[in-house]
Design a protein with these regions (language model features):
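Selective recognition of specific alpha-helical transmembrane segments in multi-pass small-molecule
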Residues: 49, 53, 152-164, 227-253, ...
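Hydrophobic alpha-helical segments and their helix-loop junctions in multi-pass secondary transporters
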Residues: 91, 95, 154-180, 198-199, ...
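Membrane-water interface regions at transmembrane-helix termini and the short interhelical loops
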Residues: 60-64, 68, 127-149, 214-217, ...
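Membrane-interface loop-to-helix entry segments
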Residues: 135-164, 343-355, 374-382
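TM-loop-TM module centered on a large, flexible mid-protein loop between adjacent transmembrane helices
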Residues: 65-71, 241-294, 345
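Hydrophobic, membrane-embedded alpha-helices of multi-pass small-molecule transporters
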Residues: 9-17, 163-169, 179-245, 284-293, ...
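Hydrophobic, small-residue-rich membrane helices and short re-entrant helix-turn-helix hairpins
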Residues: 137-148, 185, 208-237, 255-267, ...
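A generic transmembrane alpha-helix motif of multi-pass inner-membrane proteins
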Residues: 370, 374-441
C-alpha cells in the first residue's frame, strides 16, 4: 500500500510541478518581506491544500469527476465543463505555455536575438516530439516520469534551494509590499490560486485512477488507504519545495527595478543560479526548467487525450494525442505573453466552478443534498464567474458594479458566499440525493 501510494504520488507530483510552481514561491518570498511565514502558510494552504483535496476527491471514486458531475448536476454539463477545462489546461493554454516557458527561461538566454525566433521553432519541435512519443504509451508513464524524470528535477531544485539557503540565509528580508503588510496570509492564499493546480487536479485525477488500477488492489479499503498516501506524498513534496523556494526569494537581494513588475521570481531563479553555479548557471537553469515543464506537458497530453477518448471513443487515443500535441506546438510558437493573455479569462471562470463542485462533492459524502439545489449552486457560481470576467477583463461596468457588492469581491471571491448559501439550501430543498458508495471492479 505505502509503496503503491508513494510511486503514484511521485508521478503526480512530477506532472503537477511546472514552471509556474517554480516562479511564484520566490516571488512571494521577495514581496512578503518580514511577513514571510504567514504569507507562505496562506500560499501552501491554497496552492497545495485545495489542489490535493481536489485530487483526493477525484480519485476516491474510481469513476472520477465525470461521474460525480453527471449525477449531481447533469450529464451535458459534465461534458461541457470538463471539455472546456481539459482544452484550457491542455492544448490551448497550459501545454503550449509549459513549452514556451521552458524555452524563454532556459534556452532563449543562450541564443542571440537574431536566432531566437528560429530557436523557438526548433526547440518546441524537439520538445513536443519527445513528449508525444512518451504519451503514446500511457501505461508506461509511471516508469518514465514517476521513477525517472521526477527525481531528476526534484534533485536539481533541492540543490538550488539548499545551496541558496547556505549562501543567502543570513541576508535580511526586504520590506514587504503593501498587500502583504495589510494581510500576509490572505495575500499568500490568493497567490496560491496562480498555480491553477486545482484545475489540473481534476485532469490528473484521471491519470491517478488509471495508474492505481494498473497497480492492482485486493480490496476497497486498500485502494482508499493508498489514495491518502498519494495525497500525503504530493502535499509534502509540494510544501517542502514551496517553502524552500520561498525562503530563497525571501533572503535573495532583489534590486528595486526587478521588484517593480510584481513578479520577481524569474529574476531570482536566474540570478541565484548564476551566482551559485557561475559559468554553468544557464545550463543548470535550462535543465531544471525544461525537465520540470516537460513532465507537466506529458501529463497534460495523456490526461486530455484519455478524457476525450473516454467521452468520444469513436476517435482513438492516438489520434487525440497527435492532434493535441500539434495544437500545442502551433500555439507555443505564438509566444508566452499571448498565451497568458488569452488564457486568464477562461481560467478565472473555471476556477470558481471547480472549487464549488469540490465543495458539493465533499458535503454530499456526508449528507444528502438536493439535486435541484446543487444545480442552482453551480448555475449561480457560473453566472458570477462569467460576470466577474466580463466586468473586469472586458470593462462591462454594470456587471462589475453588481459583482462588487457581493461579499469578498475585493478578495476576488465574490462567488464564495453564494456557493455556501446554495449548499445550505441543498440541505432543505426536495429531491435529496445520497452520495454513491463505489465498489471495486
Amino acid at each position: 500500500m505505502a509503496k503503491k501510494g508513494a510511486l503514484t504520488g511521485l508521478l503526480l507530483f512530477g506532472i503537477f510541478f511546472g514552471a509556474g510552481n517554480l516562479i511564484f514561491p520566490p516571488s512571494l518570498g521577495a514581496l512578503s518581506g518580514e511577513h514571510f511565514l504567514p504569507a507562505i502558510a496562506g500560499f501552501v494552504f491554497s496552492g497545495v491544500g485545495i489542489a490535493v483535496l481536489t485530487l483526493i476527491i477525484g480519485t476516491l471514486n474510481p469513476k472520477g469527476y465525470i461521474y460525480e458531475i453527471s449525477t449531481k448536476i447533469a450529464p451535458w454539463f459534465a461534458t461541457l465543463y470538463l471539455s472546456v477545462l481539459y482544452l484550457s489546461i491542455g492544448p490551448f493554454f497550459a501545454i503550449p505555455r509549459t513549452a514556451t516557458t521552458a524555452y524563454e527561461v532556459g534556452i532563449s538566454p543562450l541564443l542571440s536575438d537574431a536566432n531566437k525566433g528560429l530557436g523557438l521553432i526548433v526547440f518546441t519541435l524537439l520538445y513536443f516530439a519527445a513528449a508525444y512519443l512518451i504519451s503514446l504509451n500511457p501505461s508506461k508513464i509511471l516508469d518514465r516520469i514517476g521513477r525517472v524524470l521526477t527525481p531528476v528535477f526534484a534533485i536539481l531544485i533541492v540543490i538550488l534551494v539548499v545551496l541558496g539557503a547556505f549562501k543567502y540565509g543570513g541576508t535580511s528580508p526586504q520590506a514587504a509590499s503593501a498587500a502583504y503588510q495589510a494581510s500576509a496570509f490572505g495575500t499568500g492564499f490568493l497567490e496560491g490560486y496562480n498555480t491553477l493546480d486545482a484545475l489540473a487536479s481534476v485532469a490528473f485525477s484521471v491519470i491517478a485512477v488509471q495508474t492505481l488500477k494498473q497497480l492492482g488492489f485486493s480490496s476497497k479499503k486498500e485502494y482508499i488507504s493508498t489514495i491518502w498516501v498519494v495525497g500525503i506524498v504530493v502535499a509534502l513534496a509540494f510544501s517542502a519545495l514551496y517553502i524552500g523556494l520561498g525562503f530563497l526569494g525571501n533572503h535573495f537581494p532583489v534590486p528595486a527595478e526587478a521588484m517593480k513588475g510584481g513578479t520577481p521570481g524569474v529574476y531570482i531563479l536566474s540570478q541565484a543560479t548564476q551566482e551559485i553555479f557561475g559559468s554553468t548557471a544557464q545550463l543548470f537553469l535550462a535543465a531544471m526548467v525544461t525537465v520540470t515543464c516537460f513532465t507537466t506537458t506529458v501529463g497534460l497530453i495523456v490526461s486530455t487525450a484519455e478524457f476525450f477518448n473516454g467521452r468520444f471513443p469513436q476517435i482513438s487515443y492516438k489520434v487525440y494525442a497527435t492532434v493535441f500535441t500539434l495544437i500545442g506546438f502551433a500555439i507555443a510558437n505564438l509566444g508566452l505573453s499571448a498565451i497568458i493573455k488569452y488564457s486568464i479569462p477562461v481560467l478565472v471562470i473555471l476556477y470558481p466552478i471547480t472549487i464549488a463542485i469540490v465543495m458539493i462533492v465533499i458535503v454530499n459524502k456526508f449528507v444528502a443534498l438536493s439535486k435541484p439545489g446543487m444545480q442552482l449552486t453551480i448555475a449561480v457560481v457560473t453566472a458570477i464567474a462569467i460576470a466577474s470576467v466580463l466586468g473586469s477583463s472586458f470593462k462591462v461596468e454594470f456587471l462589475a458594479n453588481l459583482v462588487n457588492v457581493l461579499p469578498f469581491a475585493k478578495a476576488s471571491l465574490p462567488w464564495l458566499v453564494p456557493a455556501i448559501v446554495g449548499i445550505l439550501l441543498s440541505l432543505v430543498l426536495p429531491n435529496k440525493q445520497e452520495s454513491d458508495v463505489f465498489e471495486m471492479d
